[in-house]
Amino acid sequence: MLSNAKLLLSLAMASTALGLVSNSSSSVIVVPSSDATIAGNDTATPAPEPSSAAPIFYNSTATATQYEVVSEFTTYCPEPTTFVTNGATFTVTAPTTLTITNCPCTIEKPTSETSVSSTHDVETNSNAANARAIPGALGLAGAVMMLL
């Protein structure tokens, strides 16, 4: 029973220290500001400053158009419209699927390919003082949690 209480206290303290905000669909963790102090046994180390150089990402989209000559094609019209294909005018008054056989017809198929790249390597901060971030941020409650 006591170990369950310790676990619940630890979870409550951890979520309080980091500012865990949650609802049924998502969670957000708010990290303490850079003014926070991380406390160890007998020392206090200022929290590391966030990196001022965020990685730069570039998105690239290449668009190409492919053409295909077909003997017939099927299209869906979800609402009333009028269009012309091979000199014939088609009028649609309600949602319907049409098969056009007045061909040969050239179908245009736009395609695109997206790529993402970064100009920076991802680095992690491995400061030994971070191991005690939660108890330090909680003060006395954190010290009590460490004793349990």
UniProtKB/Swiss-Prot annotation:
Lipidation (GPI-anchor amidated asparagine): 127
Top-rank taxon: Eukaryota
Matches recorded under InterPro entries: Sed1/Spi1
Range of residues in the leader sequence: 1-19
Residues cleaved off as propeptide: 128-148
Localization (cell): Secreted, Cell wall; Membrane
Keyword Membrane (UniProt): yes
GO molecular function: structural constituent of cell wall
Predominant place of localization: secreted
Induction: Induced by transcription factors MSN2 and MSN4 in stationary phase and by transcription factors MSN2, MSN4 and HAA1 upon weak-acid stress. Up-regulated by low pH.
GO annotation (BP), single: fungal-type cell wall organization
PTM statement from Swiss-Prot or TrEMBL: The GPI-anchor is attached to the protein in the endoplasmic reticulum and serves to target the protein to the cell surface. There, the glucosamine-inositol phospholipid moiety is cleaved off and the GPI-modified mannoprotein is covalently attached via its lipidless GPI glycan remnant to the 1,6-beta-glucan of the outer cell wall layer.
Membrane topology: Lipid-anchor; GPI-anchor
The keyword Transmembrane appears for this protein: no
Gene Ontology annotations for the cellular component aspect, listed alphabetically: cell periphery; extracellular region; fungal-type cell wall; side of membrane
Glycosylation sites: 41, 59
Keywords, ordered alphabetically: Cell wall, Glycoprotein, GPI-anchor, Lipoprotein, Membrane, Secreted, Signal
Entry's family note: Belongs to the SED1 family.
Primary role: Cell wall protein that plays a role in adaptation and resistance to cell wall stress.
This protein's name: Uncharacterized cell wall protein SPI1
Species of the source: Saccharomyces cerevisiae (strain ATCC 204508 / S288c)
Gene assigned in the entry: SPI1
